Design a protein with these regions (language model features):
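Alpha-to-beta junction loops
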Residues: 32, 95, 111, 143-145, ...
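Surface-exposed binding/hinge segments that line
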Residues: 128-172
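N-terminal lobe/hinge region of extracytoplasmic solute-binding protein
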Residues: 35-85, 113-116, 185
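N-terminal signal peptide c-region/cleavage motif recognized by signal peptidases
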Residues: 23-24
Length: 264
């Protein structure tokens, strides 16, 4: 089994790590261990501007769309959408049969709850400006959502494809309030197990995941390892399956190790 170190620019490689672990492309089974260079400050995707933290939240959360490895927008919880001729009204057809980790249904009302939350200035969420072009959000029916913009904005779907535009369980938001930052409940491939602040954020395979056959691994652990040499050593000893970031001099050394794949 080859270990992987990602030394690509952070915006593309880190956000792919959770998906790579879930796909099992380098793991036959078991748990994926990801050694990362900093401690996430929250697990609320709407309240961080840190790419590392956003990457971790992708373990548990999904949005209507996402960027693939080539930075092209792909459908996730939205199956399709239409735009009015004036560019103001977006109507989305949502994916049926999707459940949150708490067993509640994903639907248009859930999307509205999340967008209304981030747009509410009283909540003071860090990603609010990403959604400030939205005038209103309407749940037309359980699987149809309508978003009206204040003015036409061509890259609007890109805003919804960003990992911060994740859909949190409304029931969990009601239960935890601001503490949702420590109790993530989404529709992603892994459900939250625990967060030991200096040790690891742990997720387990979500048996009710809508994408059949995924995830390919039983669990994932994000371990904050602040020292570069320690992350490199963890790859070599098998204590970690992925590591990010590492300096180029470390990458050059690891390229010579047969069981380690360096992606640049």
């Amino acid at each position: 089994m080859k270990k992987t170190i990602h030394s690509r620019r952070i915006a593309s490689s880190l956000l792919a790590l959770a998906a790579l672990a879930a796909s099992g492309s380098v793991l036959a089974a078991g748990n994926a261990i990801l050694a990362i260079g900093q401690q996430p400050e929250t697990l609320d995707p709407y309240n961080t501007n840190t790419t590392m933290t956003t990457a971790v939240t992708k373990t548990f959360y999904e949005g209507l769309f996402q960027f693939d490895k080539d930075l092209k927008v792909r459908n996730v919880l939205a199956e399709s959408y239409d735009v009015s001729k004036d560019g103001l009204v977006y109507t989305f057809k949502l994916r049926a049969g999707v459940k949150f980790h708490d067993g509640t249904e994903f639907n248009a009302a859930a999307v509205k709850t999340n967008l209304d939350r981030v747009m509410n200035p009283e909540n003071r969420l860090l990603r609010a400006t990403q959604f400030n072009r939205i005038a209103k959000v309407e749940a037309v029916n359980p699987l149809s959502l309508r978003i009206t913009l204040k003015e036409p904005f061509g890259p609007f779907i890109n805003s919804l494809a960003h990992a911060s535009a994740a859909i949190i369980s409304p029931a969990a938001l009601q239960k935890w309030g601001k503490d949702i930052a420590f109790h993530p409940v989404g529709t992603g491939p892994f459900e939250f197990v625990e967060w030991k602040q200096t040790e690891a954020i742990v997720g387990k395979k979500f048996d009710g995941y809508w994408k059949k056959g995924y995830p390919k691994v039983d669990g994932v652990s994000w371990k904050p390892v602040l020292e570069n040499n320690t992350r490199a050593a963890m790859l070599q000893t098998g204590e970690a399956d992925f590591a990010y970031p590492l300096p180029y001099e470390q990458a050059a050394i690891l390229k010579k190790v047969d069981k380690i794949e360096v992606v640049t």
